[in-house]
Amino acid sequence: MSLLVFLCQIIVLSVLFFSEVCLAGKKIPANFVFGDSLVDAGNNNYLATLSKANYVPNGIDFGSPTGRFTNGRTIVDIVYQALGSDELTPPYLAPTTSGSLILNGVNYASGGSGILNSTGKLFGERINVDAQLDNFATTRQDIISWIGESEAAKLFRSAIFSVTTGSNDLINNYFTPVISTLQRKVVAPEVFVDTMISKFRLQLTRLYQLGARKIVVINIGPIGCIPFERESDPAAGNNCLAEPNEVAQMYNLKLKTLVEELNKNLQGSRFVYGDVFRIVDDIIQNYSSYGFESEKIPCCSLVGKVGGLIPCGPPSKVCMDRSKYVFWDPYHPTEAANIIIARRLLSGDTSDIYPINIRQLANLKINA
């Protein structure tokens, strides 16, 4: 036996041993994250895009800007830590996201992305859901190379997959100011929503075919209440915009039906529907009871009448106490709001997350 062959065998055995130890000692499931800027952990840092958050004051309570579109942690960060993780799920495009690190999960989310490939064009580069699934397929092969088909299948069966998408398909596609005026005249909301659902059905089915079994699907929040939408229509006054919320709820109703359909048709799957619209709407309507002082004005914004239209950046002013604001910037919640949302998704009843919550999902044994 040559020295080279011997060394190669040692390396292979070491990798297999390490992988088995890593899996055997795993107390929490791997975490695979798909979605948009609500859960992006820094993938857009590596893209030529206007949708970036890797500059101050973003991440002010994180220690430094990471590419997260908030002052601190995202919902998936909080959920994964609550399940017992000491680490946060790394972004797919980061050069360090490789080797045994991927056995704990990967974040594929991209700011500005959506279900439809036409969504987010105005930002430049973004990784829409189809491309995120392509990236997961690559990770899947890497994991199989590390630990083999059988162990990889076990890992994927126990892993938590979350998909947080759809908001940009409305905000930055169907309801894009000025640009989408003609589209809304010729495409009825019902038709657009049906297009989203049809595409999403294919995407979630593909995720299942790639090995995912425990899948959390987050609906669209009350986008008519975000500072950007309020500021874009002065006639709304202090009210949320009705039409974006109505279309979001039209989509959400069909999404819940889709989740029930997939649970019925895809053997061994457990899809869970997270009603973030209901949770965030409750926070906004009852903000003071949650300890917030502002549910309309973003913590990070430019001074002036249109401050709620401009993304958070170096020229922005930051509120003194981030824990008192529901919104960090014109689009995204603060960490304080994210904590409330995450807790209700983790442990809420069926009015918040259906048919089971994330803690129950994590403990669920799936053999198929």
Swiss-Prot record:
Q: Is rRNA processing set as a keyword in this record? A: no
| Glycosylated residues (UniProt) | 117, 286
List the subcellular locations: Secreted
Q: Which UniProt keywords apply?
A: Glycoprotein, Hydrolase, Lipid degradation, Lipid metabolism, Secreted, Signal
Q: Which InterPro entries match?
A: GDSL, GDSL_esterase/lipase, SGNH_hydro_sf, SGNH_plant_lipase-like
Gene Ontology biological process: lipid catabolic process
Q: What is its EC number?
A: 3.1.1.-
| Gene Ontology CC terms | extracellular region
Q: Which Pfam families match?
A: Lipase_GDSL
GO molecular function terms listed in the Swiss-Prot or TrEMBL record: hydrolase activity, acting on ester bonds
Q: Which residues form the active site?
A: 37, 329, 332
| SUPFAM superfamilies (alphabetical) | SGNH hydrolase (SSF52266)
Secretion signal, residue range per the UniProt entry: 1-24
Family per similarity comment: Belongs to the 'GDSL' lipolytic enzyme family.
- List the PANTHER family: GDSL-LIKE LIPASE/ACYLHYDROLASE-RELATED, GDSL-LIKE LIPASE_ACYLHYDROLASE FAMILY PROTEIN, EXPRESSED
Name of the protein in question:
GDSL esterase/lipase At4g16230
What organism is this sequence from? Arabidopsis thaliana (Mouse-ear cress)
Lineage of the native species?
Eukaryota, Viridiplantae, Streptophyta, Embryophyta, Tracheophyta
